[in-house]
Amino acid sequence: MISLLQVRDAVALNGRADAKLLSHQLSASLSMVEAMLEQLTVMGKLEKLNATACLSGSCKQCPEVQQCDTVVYRIAGGY
């Protein structure tokens, strides 16, 4: 079983990460990782990046842009 600290550390190591990436890296269920990310956000340890903060910069040209609803997290206060 993973801990909140492991999830927070994984986000810190990645800089920015989504639940799917963390689920794979930590070998944990997606629903567990999503719940932990939400808890860390409520605690003020992580923050959600807005939907326009695309990691690749190509979202505006992507045909799936309307269906892509990936939430990305980073350490709170990190710029």
UniProtKB/Swiss-Prot annotation:
Keyword Protein biosynthesis: no
InterPro entries documented for this protein: FeoC, Tscrpt_reg_HTH_FeoC, WH-like_DNA-bd_sf, WH_DNA-bd_sf
SUPFAM superfamilies in alphabetical order: Winged helix' DNA-binding domain
Keyword Ion transport: no
Single GO MF descriptor: iron-sulfur cluster binding
Biological role: May function as a transcriptional regulator that controls feoABC expression.
Family the UniProt entry places it in: Belongs to the FeoC family.
Designated name of the protein: Probable [Fe-S]-dependent transcriptional repressor
Organism name: Photorhabdus laumondii subsp. laumondii (strain DSM 15139 / CIP 105565 / TT01) (Photorhabdus luminescens subsp. laumondii)
